[in-house]
Amino acid sequence: MVTVRAVTAHEIPDRAPIRVTPGQQVQLGERDTTWPEFVFVTADAGSGWVPARHIEPGTGASGVVRTAYDTTELPTAAGDELTVLENDEISGWSRVRSASGREGWVPNSTIEPVPPA
């Protein structure tokens, strides 16, 4: 596993995270202007940003989830050391675990590799 350090803080959004599962129907909203790989989806359990490749577009503004995705983000402070669980280079985000065991997504622009000791 790769260890990274937060070079800037990452604050999480005010809305609760959502989890979508394969076969689930969702309503598609706008594309994110900062993160164009993401589309805003509304599901039974709430709304959030999901990489568009996880959604099969349907008719109109609906879609079906292709692969499971959890939108949980991890708040970080500059200097935090994190373990990378998944690096999604396409979207520009990595799923990481903190020293306390919490997991979530952070923008790749906020982290850098820690050189081996």
Which role fits each region the language model picked out?
Residues 1-117:
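Src homology 3 (SH3)-mediated interaction modules
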